[in-house]
């Protein structure tokens, strides 16, 4: 209805009579007063109902009946509420509504998520309702702000949206982590990444980006992993590895700034330390080579505050190693030039050191781990063909990808950012399952 306002905008209507469409999240009161906690998807705030005011407006009989109806409203009843906006210095939100009229739209009976503590599995079983809570609303607002900031960044920097397919006949990353399905008698796979297709887009259109769901059949139960998540991939021609890192750093800072600008209420709800987020914007990201990172870990492995296992040159990092490194530097940190042995086939070797590749993982501080993976791509046809074979892949499946190197190939690079990991990091929350509306994990496919 065009005459409704959102709760988040009541600050612009102090002293005015407004109408709000909302749900009753909670209710309390006694005697002649009732306090309603209202939510509408933008914010939560309090509406105050004073029985004498209802009687004054509607008369003794009707006013009393309306007040009694309000006293018996159940959790999640939907309502139209009319009243006068007042400042309220006692609440974090800063405003409340002095109710003059309330109309019930839809009743709610036996709402399962009552205002008490519930176990995580119960809440996930009722995820379709858990999304209505203040914390989950804030998480979705942070997610939305990051998506909005992504599109804004790419538009301002000359990128074109390029949609890669969800179904593919080949793997972009690790063939052991593919979801396979029947495709009219042939095998097809759910996309792990749009990157290979973005390379084709970059050779046709210049700077391109893609945003969509990707799928990894990882049998992992950590707080950082989902089997279905959303990835923001970008690819750009005529760009080297170091230049790509500059773009990635600017992008991540733009995302954080976008949340600070457009989801401040959500961050306050989540009790996020925004001074830390501002620090990440104001401070240059660190860039550390893989080998220097290994040396650093070895030098500190016997410190009292370390809890990671010993690593050798050639080993991949585990979560404890990533956490320690990023906390050591205190800002987002690029680990560059990993061993080729455990990175993807399409990455270009470091000049003069074929055992290392021109790639980087961006590690977020505060224990959030990798949020971006990127690399400069191999442009030599013969070297790429050999790497495909060395990885045990069938070159025929990559004929079209190899052909990109035949017709005017240029230096190019790109990266992928996991949306849910970025949301978790910016929101300052513990588990990635709260960063997506309906999480898909190794033990959960419903609701």
UniProtKB/Swiss-Prot annotation:
Highest taxon above the source species: Bacteria
What are the recorded GO MF terms, alphabetically? asparagine-tRNA ligase activity; ATP binding; catalytic activity, acting on a protein; nucleic acid binding; transferase activity
Keyword check for Cytoplasm: yes
Q: Which EC numbers characterise this protein's activity in its record?
A: 6.1.1.22
Q: Which reaction equations make up its catalytic activity?
A: tRNA(Asn) + L-asparagine + ATP = L-asparaginyl-tRNA(Asn) + AMP + diphosphate + H(+)
Q: Which GO terms describe its biological process?
A: asparaginyl-tRNA aminoacylation
Pfam families in the record: tRNA-synt_2, tRNA_anti-codon
As for subcellular location, the record says: Cytoplasm
Q: Which InterPro entries match?
A: Aa-tRNA-synt_II, aa-tRNA-synth_II, aa-tRNA-synth_II/BPL/LPL, Asn-tRNA-ligase, Asp/Asn-tRNA-synth_IIb, NA-bd_OB-fold, NA-bd_OB_tRNA
Q: Which UniProt keywords apply?
A: Aminoacyl-tRNA synthetase, ATP-binding, Cytoplasm, Ligase, Nucleotide-binding, Protein biosynthesis
**What GO CC annotations are associated with the protein?**
cytoplasm
> Hey, which family's this protein in?
Belongs to the class-II aminoacyl-tRNA synthetase family.
* Binding partners and assembly: Homodimer.
Q: Which HAMAP family match?
A: Asn_tRNA_synth
- The protein in question is named Asparagine--tRNA ligase
Species? Lactococcus lactis subsp. cremoris (strain SK11)
Q: Which gene encodes it?
A: asnS
